[in-house]
């Protein structure tokens, strides 16, 4: 568990292909993650067996597909993908950012 997140003290984790992330904070039941995308970077379609996910567009814009439904989301928009729903994104602008919230925490990220 991390009670406080200090941005300047937390390095980016490079994921490759124009995507990097910072784990903001977590408990056993909840996790928040900042994910930064280069223009054209792809969050490959996938689904979670046990995690619900809410993603808030903090900057830029994304093409989002959930269960085959495609939408364009811009700064201030959000989406939810519950467990077992196929979802993915494509960044439409340089520096697009998602704030992802997962329940329960993504132990595989720690």
Curated annotation (Swiss-Prot):
InterPro entries: Bacilysin_H2HPP_isomerase, Cupin_2, KdgF, RmlC-like_jellyroll, RmlC_Cupin_sf. Residues 35-94 form the Cupin type-2 domain. GO terms for biological process: pectin catabolic process. It holds the Pfam family Cupin_2. CDD domains: cupin_KdgF. It comes from the Bacteria. Pathway: Glycan metabolism; pectin degradation. PANTHER family: H2HPP ISOMERASE. May have a role in pathogenicity. This is Pectin degradation protein KdgF. It comes from Dickeya dadantii (strain 3937) (Erwinia chrysanthemi (strain 3937)). The lineage of its organism: Bacteria, Pseudomonadati, Pseudomonadota, Gammaproteobacteria, Enterobacterales. The gene is kdgF.
